[in-house]
């Protein structure tokens, strides 16, 4: 895929996308603002404790890759940063408000169910119902310039499948339920065969013993 982000780059871009919608009065963000956003505990998984230098390194890299741009002057005190990852004037990636909300939440929290995504993305976009969430996820998974989202195999004991963004490369699926059941079936079959052999050997020994007693 054209868009490849490290875990830290995904966190920085996710934070800028989030703040652009939820706190527009504070956007663009200063470097310190990005540090605070990256390390906040609410709506982050995993919770990070990045230093200013670590965040600054990510900001510099993303500016070089044209995913961010710096803003200065016109009343701004110091350099601030705004995202050019999507919906920028000359950028290729165009996303709807619903798509931005889901992508942002996935960038910030990793794999989640559609229900979790609807709840956690609510500050950015109010989905009418679960059908709209599922429809938007399907669109992201089937875009010609994507896919940007993948549905993961349902984990054992879980009622719902989770979704994950693909901006950090392919996602390794957890073992599917059917795969695990097949593995269990194979193990049971091997144990049954071993027991059958053991029973056959015991039967032979019993027959031999009875024959000996008969003599």
From Swiss-Prot:
Residue numbers of N6-acetyllysine PTMs: 80
Residue ranges the record marks as coiled coil: none
Keyword Zinc recorded: no
Keywords recorded for this protein, A-Z: Acetylation
InterPro entries referenced in this protein's UniProt entry, alphabetically: DUF480 (IPR007432), WH-like_DNA-bd_sf (IPR036388), WH_DNA-bd_sf (IPR036390)
Transmembrane domains' residue ranges: none
Family stated for the protein in its record: Belongs to the UPF0502 family.
This protein's name: UPF0502 protein YceH
Protein species of origin: Shigella dysenteriae serotype 1 (strain Sd197)
């Amino acid at each position: 895929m054209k868009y490849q982000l490290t875990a830290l780059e995904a966190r920085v871009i996710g934070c800028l996308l989030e703040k652009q919608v939820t706190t527009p009065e504070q956007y663009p963000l200063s470097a310190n603002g990005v540090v605070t956003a990256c390390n906040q505990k609410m709506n982050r998984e995993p919770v990070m404790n990045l230093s200013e230098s670590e965040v600054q390194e990510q900001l510099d890299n993303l500016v070089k890759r044209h995913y961010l741009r710096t803003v200065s002057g016109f009343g701004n005190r110091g350099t601030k940063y705004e995202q050019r990852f999507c919906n920028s004037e000359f950028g290729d990636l165009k996303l709807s408000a619903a798509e931005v909300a889901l992508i942002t939440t996935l960038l910030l929290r990793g794999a989640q169910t559609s229900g979790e995504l609807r709840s956690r993305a609510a500050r950015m976009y109010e989905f009418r119902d679960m059908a709209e969430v599922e429809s938007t996820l399907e669109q992201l998974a089937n875009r010609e310039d994507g896919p940007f989202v993948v549905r993961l195999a349902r984990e054992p004991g879980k009622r719902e499948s989770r979704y994950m963004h693909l901006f950090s490369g392919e996602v390794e699926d957890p073992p599917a339920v059917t795969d695990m059941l097949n593995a269990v079936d194979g193990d049971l079959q091997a144990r049954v065969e071993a027991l059958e052999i053991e029973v056959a050997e015991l039967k032979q020994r019993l027959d031999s013993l009875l024959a000996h007693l008969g003599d």
